[in-house]
Amino acid sequence: MKPIVSIIMGSTSDLPVMEKAAKLLDEMQVPFEMNALSAHRTPAEVETFAKGAAERGIKVIIAAAGMAAALPGVIAANTTLPVIGVPVKGSVLDGVDALYSIIQMPPGIPVATVAINGAMNAAILAVQMLALADAELAQKFAAYKEGLKNKIVKANEELKEVKYAYKTN
């Protein structure tokens, strides 16, 4: 099985955040790979990865980084594939530095950016992109969204049972 999504993180310290993306891709049965590459420590390897990703069959790249967070932008500069950036909380600025680094890209080098530590939404966005050309995946994703809706419906039913003197519903 060949991966169609690549999850790249600046270091394995980002793994606890990025596992959420991996679990969602696994649940949706989307083949993926996970690797650590650093825009600052392994710049040549990042360039090689980005330039060869499409040829290897990758369709979407999810790139996570904290602090200066150059990784998603460097990857985007070296590929025509969509890149989804995940700013990782981990510095004294609670990930805001990473968010600004990833979201402030120059024209022509976009990185679709999710919330700080938003790996789950990054995977969801990747699945939505892939589902445009994959009817089976689109059905799986629709079922996933229906499940999210059902959780809220159930929660509201449970909240009806919560009693307070001045609660009106």
Task: Give the positions of each predicted feature.
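Short beta->alpha connector loops at strand-helix junctions that form conserved
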Residues: M9, A65, V86-K89, V114-A115
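N-terminal beta-loop-helix "entrance" segment that forms/cooperates
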Residues: M34-E55
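Glycine-rich phosphate-binding loop
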Residues: F49-P87
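Structural motif
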Residues: I4-I7, E33, K59-I61, L81-I84, ...
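Glycine/small-residue-rich loop that forms an oxyanion/phosphate-binding "nest" at active or ligand-binding sites
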Residues: M67, N78-I102, P107
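C-terminal binding/interaction regions
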Residues: P3, M9-P16, K20, V96-N169
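Glycine-rich phosphate/diphosphate-binding loop of Rossmann-like nucleotide-binding domains
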Residues: K2-R41
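Short glycine/serine/threonine-rich phosphate/pyrophosphate-binding segments
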Residues: D14-M18, T42-V46, A65-V74, L93-V96, ...
